[in-house]
Amino acid sequence: MMELIKQLPHIEPYGNPQYFLYVITAILPIFIGLFFKKRFGWYEILVSLFFIVTMLTGGKTNQLAALGIYLIWQMVLVLFYKQYRKVRDGKWIFYLVSLLSLLPIIFVKVQPAINGTQSLLGFVGISYLTFRSVGIIIELRDGVIKDLKMWEYLRFLLFMPTFSSGPIDRFKRFNENYKTIPERDELLDMLAESVRYIMWGFLYKFILAHILGEILLPPLKNLALQTGGVFNYYVVAIMYTFGFELFFDFAGYSMFAIAISNLMGIRSPINFNKPFLSRDLKEFWNRWHMSLSFWFRDFVFMRMVMVMTRKKLFKNRNVTSSVAYVLNMLLMGFWHGITWFYIAYGLFHGIGLVMNDAWVRKKKTLNKERKKAGRPPFPENRWIQLLGMVITFHVVMVSFLIFSGFLNDLWFKK
């Protein structure tokens, strides 16, 4: 059996146009079944497993074995906590189970930073499965999830279109969506949306991201390294080129994932909503990698604020929210990887959000003072909004330069 699995080709999800020929052919019966108000549950499982297996194999089975161990580990934790939550609500058991659920991703992220080798527990998609697993544990405690069947749990974790890189869904929304087969008119709308997303995704990922990342970026990096110094003009070009390449690559991927989800009768959450039109950093995080930022907002930021408020760690609520912003974004930086530039990226955005909130509060105070003095408030016309967009865009691009890791090559690798 293992030899047969080893002989399977490696098929990178959404890695090339040929992938869509395979996946659309495979899920066409699913869409036809939905059109006639039928879900072919076992066929869906087989399709998902086939594409996940080929995603993780290609001569080796270590990633597949890691996935199997991971699923058993998470299932044991969720089963235990589901039964425990029916009779008790101890916070320390909740913290312990959440930590144990996070252990695999902690090992995967920390090991390369310690000895430079990849963890045997790692596999494509482990980060996004962890968000789903921990999210379920949190929602079991909150009472959002009243009942959880293991086959529904596995179906949620192993949903093929979003397995490798999201978008990050929530169990309750996904499960309710799965159980409700769309009406024919809605299904046809989802088909039209899928075609549109796939076309835009081809433009974003296979044309624009390819031009920026494969054609323009390498020579710019070489020129910047040859020029040397702490900073040079080529670094500015790298900043914008990488920033747009990152957006087009990931936004294109997200469009593909949503399109294939639609064809399987599931409306996965959108990930990007014109992020470069944001007027401030807070709005940016409501438009950029939305399923990730909303996950951190709901399950990390809001809970830190509640805990710090309940324990009265700070007298001022603005200080509480500021500390939560920084810790939340630092944690997001660590999630990307244990390197100084990912951590600096998180800290950069954490401080940026603190400054953003401080300016909003300051502007409100100044407007009140101006009103008392009989003067008009600061203008909020389209030109001011445009200025906010321009400033936010460039601040974000600076953060993407940090995120790219190129400054590490420029400053420390000789």
PLM feature spans:
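Membrane-embedded transmembrane alpha-helical bundles that form the catalytic cores
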Residues: 2-414
